[in-house]
């Protein structure tokens, strides 16, 4: 696979039409002196931000809707994202040892988790996500944060051909979007250095047995959900991909304290995806979303 060809296609998409307009508007903000705090809310603070510049920043942030992962605060502009992503990150944080490591975040969205990882002193962080929209969101936030995080508009399928390998890979909320989950796990494994580890999460079916739900059309109104496994099935997938040391870190029911509609997204959110008369079921009648967080090694 020619990943440079894939890069060029995404670069061309980034540099055309509205995407190019937004990219240039971000660059036109200029070099603004600020301080950044990478806590539950990514907080960007300014000493003397003019009202005119603040209005530019607000307009740009609005043009980048919908905002899924976060939240972010830029001066007094609070980007109240659909997901309270700190809930997931704080579940994982006690298990992280990233000091001096080369880290990848596969399906990194706008970079929220990568910004949080900076507090753990990794050697290098590289994000992978083919979405030009979220790449622009990252560019917007990183314009102020000025980090050395690298953002590749590539997918998990490009990992076996990437120029370098990683000590730790995060792959959060991706595997159920792949029609061949075992192949995806093998792609993750191919990108690891010896002794490497993967932090993985997925929606799961809270039952015993080695099977997976394969929704006919949608799951929680999401069309590209292929398999929602039991934990036993997930462990089997990982073992087939030649991972070892399958460790369950946490499980959690997804609720409206974590995922909800805000003015910073368009369309619907979790409250619209569940049965209005029984929130233990999705609108389609499947078990409502629960997530399991695991660590696997090679």
Curated annotation (Swiss-Prot):
Name of this protein: tRNA U34 carboxymethyltransferase
List the catalysed reactions.
carboxy-S-adenosyl-L-methionine + 5-hydroxyuridine(34) in tRNA = 5-carboxymethoxyuridine(34) in tRNA + S-adenosyl-L-homocysteine + H(+)
Q: What is this enzyme's EC?
A: 2.5.1.-
Q: Which NCBIfam families match?
A: PRK15068.1, tRNA 5-methoxyuridine(34)/uridine 5-oxyacetic acid(34) synthase CmoB
Protein's UniProt keywords contain Transcription regulation: no
* CDD domains for this protein: AdoMet_MTases (cd02440)
Q: What is the lineage of its organism?
A: Bacteria, Pseudomonadati, Campylobacterota, Epsilonproteobacteria, Campylobacterales
The job of this chain, per UniProt, is described as: Catalyzes carboxymethyl transfer from carboxy-S-adenosyl-L-methionine (Cx-SAM) to 5-hydroxyuridine (ho5U) to form 5-carboxymethoxyuridine (cmo5U) at position 34 in tRNAs.
Q: Which ranges form a coiled coil?
A: none
Q: Which organism is it from?
A: Campylobacter curvus (strain 525.92)
């Amino acid at each position: 696979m020619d990943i440079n060809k894939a890069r060029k296609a995404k670069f061309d998409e980034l540099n055309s039409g509205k995407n190019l307009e937004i990219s240039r508007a971000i660059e036109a903000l200029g070099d603004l002196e600020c301080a950044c705090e990478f806590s539950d809310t990514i907080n960007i603070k300014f000493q003397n931000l003019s009202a005119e510049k603040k209005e530019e920043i607000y307009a740009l942030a609005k043009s980048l809707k919908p905002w899924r992962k976060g939240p972010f605060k830029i001066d007094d502009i609070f980007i109240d994202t659909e997901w309270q992503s700190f809930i997931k990150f704080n579940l994982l944080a006690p298990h992280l040892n990233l000091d001096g490591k080369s880290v990848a975040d596969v399906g990194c969205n706008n970079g929220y988790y990568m910004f949080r990882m900076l507090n753990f002193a990794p050697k290098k962080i590289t994000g992978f996500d083919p979405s030009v929209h979220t790449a622009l969101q990252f560019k917007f936030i990183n314009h102020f944060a000025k980090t050395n995080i690298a953002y590749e508009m590539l997918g998990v399928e490009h990992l076996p051909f990437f120029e370098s390998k990683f000590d730790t890979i995060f792959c959060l909320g991706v595997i159920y979007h792949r029609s061949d989950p075992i192949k995806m796990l093998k792609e993750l494994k191919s990108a690891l250095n010896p002794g490497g580890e993967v932090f993985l999460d997925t929606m799961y079916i809270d039952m015993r047995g080695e099977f997976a739900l394969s929704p006919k059309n949608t799951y929680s109104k999401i069309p590209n959900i292929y398999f929602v496994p039991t934990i036993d099935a997930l462990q089997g997938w990982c073992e087939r991909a030649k991972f070892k040391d399958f460790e369950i870190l946490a499980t959690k029911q997804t609720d409206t304290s974590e995922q909800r509609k805000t003015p910073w997204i368009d369309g619907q959110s979790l409250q619209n995806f569940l049965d209005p008369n029984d929130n233990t079921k999705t609108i389609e009648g499947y078990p409502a979303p629960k997530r399991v967080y695991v660590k696997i090694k090679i």
